[in-house]
């Protein structure tokens, strides 16, 4: 496959060559090379020419309808959209080497700093995502058009995310890695062998000498490091010969050691399947028959048919490593299991106080402890079975029932004994229940578990979220509608808050509930809806949205975008809590009061600080669509930022019950000094892999419209960017058939990129007439970590001039 012509400096070419060499030898890569992903086409396609200007590179192209096939592993064969992929055999694994196309699938987001760290001995929560074979809508790296996609957003309850499928090497789709990392959750792929074919595969790399299994381990580590996820679940679902099972512990030890060297915080987990004799014999516990595998890696994932006596026996086997034992809970409740479905919480137990979750705080009457959500219970799903059977068959059976099973049993027992938990296939609420009720069922399911799931805190700034789920019925950019129609883009999901419903006051008349909502958005496709009733005896209610443990710089800038819906006189304010109260000093005009040594209400700025006016010029103004932005500037010294809360207060003189509905569109907490630092510019934008097709409506005769597909590449320091917004002048995206051509002064938004490359697919453009040149300009807008917009003059750009064949 030939690539478009490019112009890059010699230094950039040398840097790319060093990077590819580093991928072949991971231990030689520097941190700078790890952060600077800039794939480049290397050869000139015949018939193309370029010229350089001071501000843009111009590419010339003669339209041709000749096929230019792309490798099907990396691109969808029907649309040429980039896709995430898996490896199906040992041969594919050993033959894998990084290619330029792999750059689409490399995670942009590093694993966010969190407290407590994953290495702590607090019991953890693992989510094993197994849905209908995997690689569904989530495989489209740049997003897709989906009416009712699956979404997971209770990230603060989760410590480890495993992407599971029945392919030999399951590489997590990059959207899951980006989203999980943003929330401080580590991501594992799956290495699985099954049936007779799996037995032959294991014999091929385990029955020989150490070089064979070390080659497999080295390749798994290289894949982990290149795609920037965090490790592997090893699942051997077939019997092993004595020679092969004898080499399994050394293989696990070597894999774990090498992964720890190359991927800080990396994890290797073993699934309870094979025993040390080589038999495939699920134990449902850690015991003397499988302990050797646990001792050779980072953790043990038990099978699901355990009873409390299994947990009691494991206490002695696990010793001080109880948190490294992940007790499996099948949410589908297949087999002879404890809990499952809406009974899943019965397998967990802990004495931990629900005050570590989201709480309501009525200021007049102290702290109101939240009450668990009490869901309506219905009969068990009739498609359940005590047999071990195919997930696909189960899904087909249960997916047609539409019956909601019964209430919470199994997590209770796991927490009682101090073990970690592995929730298998919680997508049950999506697969087996009505799609139209998905969000209600998702919140119900996780709401019943929340008191058993310790949360973790994000501990770094900047902290910015628009509450976007990475999906929506339309796409909005800072209050301005960009496109109408359903969309789904996993990498675009932003940091999600603590969710729940809680009762306030002694008689329970007051309540507050938070949930995500696709009906309106400030930025992205969704917002956070907070509804509640302030009872007469309560003055105001503070809703804790985020748990943080972030050291803060001397001065921070905060912003909140919100709108109140319906007639109400309730007021809204942003609050924060700080730690290290003995040495923490807070100052600045925005601090209104400090009722305790650590909780602070903030007074909005009337005008933005002069130095920050370029970024925060909307402060205190009514925005489009009824949104309001409040800005704050706070001076701090020796402080730790612990919580972000939103406070709802009754109007002065009110003695009645006050109800409110508030939509939160964005919250920002950034180092004020970082807003003054210059942002690097997007450089070396190139165009390659161009494909032309006649418009679908004009397959016969000379077309007036063409469909253009091409790939953009550019250079940028990834550590300073959240994502890139891709635009063009002149053209109409085929994904939005009802959208008019943009006004000349407005470039058209095409999509989001979370890498330094982007595939444009089926963009409608005017055909060039005889002797004519048509012009398309592509623009790459960097979105800085702080979340503000960059002036258009600082975007990267490249021009495509195309003409009809002579």
Briefly describe each language-model feature range.
Residues 161, 528, 542-574, 628-636, ...:
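Extra-cytoplasmic beta-strand recognition segments
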Residues 2, 10-13, 118-310:
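Chitinase-like catalytic core of GlcNAc-active glycosidases
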Residues 761-791:
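Beta-strand-rich modules
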Residues 60-87, 97, 330-363, 388, ...:
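Substrate-binding cleft of secreted/luminal carbohydrate-active enzymes
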């Amino acid at each position: 496959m030939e690539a478009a012509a490019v112009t890059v400096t010699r230094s950039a070419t040398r840097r790319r060559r060093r990077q590819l060499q580093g991928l072949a030898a991971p231990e030689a890569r520097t941190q700078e090379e790890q952060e600077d992903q800039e794939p480049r086409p290397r050869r000139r396609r015949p018939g193309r020419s370029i010229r350089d200007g001071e501000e843009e590179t111009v590419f010339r192209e003669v339209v041709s309808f000749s096929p230019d096939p792309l490798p099907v592993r990396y691109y969808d064969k029907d649309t040429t959209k980039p896709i995430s992929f898996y490896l199906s055999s040992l041969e594919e694994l050993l033959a894998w080497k990084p290619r330029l196309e792999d750059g689409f699938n490399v995670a942009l987001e590093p694993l966010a700093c969190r407290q407590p760290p994953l290495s702590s001995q607090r019991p953890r929560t693992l989510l094993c995502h197994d849905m209908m074979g995997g690689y569904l809508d989530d495989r489209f790296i740049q997003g897709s058009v989906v009416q009712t996609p699956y979404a997971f957003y209770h990230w603060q309850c989760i410590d480890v995310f495993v992407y599971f499928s029945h392919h030999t090497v399951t590489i997590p789709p990059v959207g899951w890695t980006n989203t999980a990392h943003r929330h401080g959750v580590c991501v594992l792929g799956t290495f699985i062998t099954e049936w007779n074919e799996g037995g032959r595969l294991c014999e091929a790399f385990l029955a020989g000498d150490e070089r064979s299994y070390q080659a497999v381990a080295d390749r798994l580590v290289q894949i982990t490091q290149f795609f920037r996820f965090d490790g592997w679940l090893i699942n051997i679902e077939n019997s092993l010969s004595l020679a092969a099972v004898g080499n399994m512990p050394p293989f696990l030890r070597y894999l774990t050691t090498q992964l720890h060297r190359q991927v800080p915080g990396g994890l290797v987990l073993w699934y309870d399947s094979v025993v040390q004799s080589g038999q495939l014999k699920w134990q449902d516990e850690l015991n003397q028959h499988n302990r050797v595998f646990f001792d050779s890696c980072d953790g043990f994932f038990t099978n699901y048919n355990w009873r409390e006596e299994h947990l009691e026996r494991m206490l002695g086997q696990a010793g001080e490593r109880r948190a490294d034992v992940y007790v499996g809970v099948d949410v589908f409740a297949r087999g002879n299991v404890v809990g499952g479905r809406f009974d899943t919480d019965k397998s967990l137990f802990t004495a931990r106080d629900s005050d570590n979750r989201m709480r309501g705080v009525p200021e007049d009457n102290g702290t109101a402890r939240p009450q668990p959500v009490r869901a309506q219970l219905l009969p068990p799903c009739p498609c359940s079975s005590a047999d071990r059977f195919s997930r696909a068959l189960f899904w087909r059976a249960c997916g047609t029932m539409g019956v909601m099973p019964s209430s919470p049993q199994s997590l209770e027992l796991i927490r009682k004994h101090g073990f970690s938990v592995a929730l298998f296939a919680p997508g049950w609420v999506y697969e087996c229940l009505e799609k139209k009720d998905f969000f209600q069922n998702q919140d119900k399911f996780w709401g019943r578990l929340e008191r058993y799931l310790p949360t973790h805190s994000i501990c770094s700034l900047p902290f910015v979220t628009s509450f976007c789920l990475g999906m929506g019925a339309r796409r909005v950019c800072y209050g301005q509608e960009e496109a109408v129609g359903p969309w789904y883009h996993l990498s675009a999901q932003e940091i999600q808050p603590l969710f729940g419903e809680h009762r306030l006051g002694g008689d329970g008349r007051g309540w507050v509930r938070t949930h995500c909502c696709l009906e309106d958005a400030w930025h992205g496709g969704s917002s956070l809806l907070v509804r509640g009733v302030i009872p007469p005896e309560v003055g105001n209610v503070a809703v804790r949205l985020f748990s943080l443990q972030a050291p803060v710089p001397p001065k921070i800038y905060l912003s909140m975008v919100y709108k109140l819906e319906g007639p109400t006189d309730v007021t809204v304010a942003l609050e924060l809590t700080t730690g290290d109260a003995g040495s923490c000093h807070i100052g600045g005009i925005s601090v209104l009061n400090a009722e305790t040594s650590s909780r602070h209400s903030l007074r909005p700025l009337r005008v933005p600080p002069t130095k920050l006016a370029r970024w925060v010029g909307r402060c205190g103004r009514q925005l489009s669509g009824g949104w309001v932005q409040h800005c704050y500037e706070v001076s701090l010294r020796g402080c730790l930022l612990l919580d972000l809360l939103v406070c709802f207060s009754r109007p002065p003189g009110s003695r009645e019950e006050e109800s409110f509905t508030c939509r939160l569109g964005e919250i920002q907490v950034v180092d004020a000094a970082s807003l003054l630092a210059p942002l690097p510019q997007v450089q070396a934008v190139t165009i390659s892999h161009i494909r032309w097709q006649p418009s679908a409506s004009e397959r016969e005769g000379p077309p007036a419209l063409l469909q253009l597909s091409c790939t953009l590449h550019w250079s940028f320091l990834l550590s300073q960017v959240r994502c890139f917004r891709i635009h063009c002048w002149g053209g109409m995206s085929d994904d939005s058939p009802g959208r008019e051509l943009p006004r000349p002064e407005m470039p058209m938004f095409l999509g989001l990129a979370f890498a330094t490359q982007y595939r444009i697919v089926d963009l409608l453009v005017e055909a060039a007439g005889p002797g004519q040149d048509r012009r398309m300009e592509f623009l790459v807008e960097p979105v800085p970590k702080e979340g503000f917009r960059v002036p258009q003059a600082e975007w990267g750009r490249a021009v495509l001039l195309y003409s009809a064949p002579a």
